[in-house]
Amino acid sequence: MAGLKGKKVALNKGSNVHYLLVRALEEAGLSIRDITPVYLPPADGRAAFESRRVDAWVIWDPFQAAAEEQLRARTLRDGSGLVDNHQFYLASQTFAERHPGVIALLVEELKQVGSEVERDPRQAAEIIAPLIGLPADIAAKALGRQAFQTQFITPEVVEAQQRIADTFTDLKLIPKRLSIRDVVWTPPASAVAQSR
């Protein structure tokens, strides 16, 4: 990571990889000011990386797996032990408050599907490969690096998201401080019990 000092780095602004880059640079004794960020969506980031208009590209799977396999890109640092990466399913506050049982059923179904993917990632890769436009081996590589344990948002996840929000506020990506706890829906105990 120290070799990125003074280099152009493509990334999706305000994303999970933006936070990963900030933390990875800090770990190497650098800051975001030590590089030139080039804010691009994934497809444009790949094109810039492939054409060498940028020196590095910070991206998530399956784009990362595709770059590793198709472009022979080398991973400089992943988020292991550095950042918590979570993916979220969203509902409006009104829907969540009116239909917690439906959300509990959805969470239960997602858990079952996730267990199937973890049991047989190759089969899952064969199914999703044509949908994402990548070969099954690349989809399998990406799936193999992900966890599929869907759950309701825990206090630990709220804390991790608060750290990200605070960092983004410090970087002026978010105009004012916000409280993640205030915007996260907490299901009633009955919905949590139903999803177990």
Regions found by a protein language model. Give the residues of each.
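Conserved C-terminal helix/tail region of periplasmic/extracytoplasmic solute-binding proteins
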Residues: 169-196
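Residues that form or immediately flank small-molecule/cofactor binding pockets and catalytic motifs
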Residues: 14, 42, 80-81, 185-188
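Pocket-lining segment of extracytoplasmic ligand-binding domains
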Residues: 37-38, 43-130
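Phosphate-coordinating loops and pocket residues in cytosolic domains that bind phosphorylated ligands
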Residues: 6, 69, 185
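Short coil/loop linkers at secondary-structure junctions
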Residues: 26, 31-33, 74, 134-135, ...
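A generic structural-conservation signal
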Residues: 13, 34, 58, 77, ...
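Secondary-structure end/capping motifs
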Residues: 97-175
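Bilobed "Venus flytrap"/periplasmic-binding protein-like clamshell domains
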Residues: 1-66, 122, 158-163
